[in-house]
Amino acid sequence: NFHQGFHKGRLRGLIGAAAPCDYRPVRVEPRKIPKTGQPIDLHLIETDDVVATLGAKKGRRWVVGFALETEDHRLRALAKLERKFCDLMVSNGPQAISATDNEVEVLTPDGEVLTTIAGTKEAVAARILAIIEERLVAARRPIPD
């Protein structure tokens, strides 16, 4: 279990690259809901925020979050970075959905825009991983005797 591995210190960090969904139905029907010709009410509640939960208990581990925002990108991403106890936050907009290219900002806890990365999603991901390796993984690696 990922949560157990994180809490027991077996994992050195977390890349919270995707939120499958922010909301879930309050009630789940056990069977298909048949059509009636009438509207149905769908009540939703927020899902648990895994990155925030693990970030609050990270200790010496590192946490990288991602924020897809439709407005006030940087401001909202920085608020998430702080609220989720992240070491870095990668921010982008909805134009990334179903696109082959992406543009992101990598933000630090002091509010700095570390860098802006643009290119194919693969190239952007490779650069993000290089930044994580350089700033978080290598920086916390024990120094050999």
Predicted regions and their residues:
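A cross-family phosphate/adenosyl-ligand binding-site feature
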Residues: 1-145
